[in-house]
UniProtKB/Swiss-Prot annotation:
The gene is tal. Its EC number is 2.2.1.2. Pathway: Carbohydrate degradation; pentose phosphate pathway; D-glyceraldehyde 3-phosphate and beta-D-fructose 6-phosphate from D-ribose 5-phosphate and D-xylulose 5-phosphate (non-oxidative stage): step 2/3. The keyword Transcription regulation does not apply. This is Transaldolase. Keywords: Cytoplasm, Pentose shunt, Schiff base, Transferase. The lineage of its organism: Bacteria, Pseudomonadati, Pseudomonadota, Gammaproteobacteria, Alteromonadales. The active site is at 132 (schiff-base intermediate with substrate).
Length: 318
């Protein structure tokens, strides 16, 4: 019998949630996703020192201002890591916009254009890139404009149905609804343990998937942020699942049979009229878990971006 990972691949596109090139080579995913925390982690791998040096030298060639150099080096390093990953995966790389821009639509669009241009200068077409944005109202509005330009987006830090619905109505290419972080919140809030089938994160993604398929939305659902393989197995059949190296390893060493749990709708019905900003903000605000986890996620990504910039500043100043 094929291992669990190989059983999953025919029914769900497997994406590697890592910047570790060796892990990507090992598990042969279709796509890969990165974020500021993963870029920070990857920057500490000795084999990546040339990518950092290249980013530093490029940043110095672009400006004499240290703060601008730090920003440029961070963008170039994220793209350099993406370029290495694209040598391995046949599909796409997701590269994230600075989390500190999560409430600034105009700045998010400008950063997306800069990242796409850096990939273009390296010979990579935008069709192989997904721009990652936080699922704030401003991030969703930025994604709507980028999608209209033909730049596909991956809306991340998604914890609620309101966020998912707004993304679909904006014509976003892909969403990354989080599973494990939802489970974390409910376990802390209730003190309960949950089976994989009852896992609040699994229930959330299943609900979003079914809504999209029932209403004929083309937005891809890519479950993310897993705490265990049980969550992954319960979401077999989801459009895509982005999985970290430790759980990819566990799945490849397992022979648990896979049963497709998520199935496309046999017929579709018309969706409701699109949400207004006021409606989105109210419905999102009604979900304390989503409010807390989105804010926490943005803060944590911003902290890791800051740590990366401290490292880059030291390199630029040496």
């Amino acid at each position: 019998m094929a291992n669990t990972l190989e059983q999953l691949k025919p029914i769900t596109t497997i994406v590697a949630d890592t910047g570790d090139i060796e892990a990507i080579k090992r598990y042969q995913p279709e796509d890969a996703t990165t974020n500021p925390s993963l870029i920070l982690k990857a920057s500490q791998i000795p084999e990546y020192s040339d990518l950092i040096e290249n980013a530093i030298n490029w940043a110095k060639s672009q400006s004499d201002d240290l703060e601008q150099q730090i920003e440029d080096a961070g963008d170039k390093l994220a793209v350099n890591i993406g370029l290495e990953i694209l040598k391995i995966v046949p599909g796409r790389i997701s590269t994230e916009v600075d989390a500190r821009l999560s409430f600034d639509k105009t700045a998010s669009i400008a950063k997306a254009h800069k990242l796409i241009q850096l990939y273009k200068e390296a010979g990579i077409d935008k069709s192989r890139i997904l721009i990652k944005l936080a699922s704030t109202w401003e991030g969703i509005c930025a994604a709507k404009e980028l999608e209209q330009e033909g730049i596909n987006c991956n809306l991340t830090l998604l914890f609620s149905f309101a966020q998912a619905r707004a993304c679909a109505e904006a014509g976003v290419y892909l969403i990354s609804p989080f599973v494990g972080r939802i489970l974390d919140w409910y376990k802390k809030d209730t003190g309960l343990e949950y089976s994989a089938a009852e896992d609040p994160g699994v229930v959330s993604v299943t609900s979003i998937y079914n809504y999209y398929k029932r209403h004929g939305f083309n937005t891809v659902v890519m479950g993310a942020s897993f705490r265990n393989t049980g969550e992954i197995i319960e979401l077999a059949g989801c459009d895509r699942l982005t999985i970290g190296p430790a759980l990819l390893e566990e799945l490849s060493n397992s022979n648990t049979p896979i049963i497709q749990k998520l199935l496309p709708a046999t017929e579709t019905i018309a969706a409701q009229p699109a949400m207004s900003e006021a409606q989105f903000r109210w419905e999102f605000n009604e979900d304390p878990m989503a409010v807390e986890k989105l804010a926490e996620g943005i803060r944590n990504f911003a902290v890791d971006q800051g740590k990366l910039e401290v490292m880059l500043k030291a390199e630029l100043s040496s």
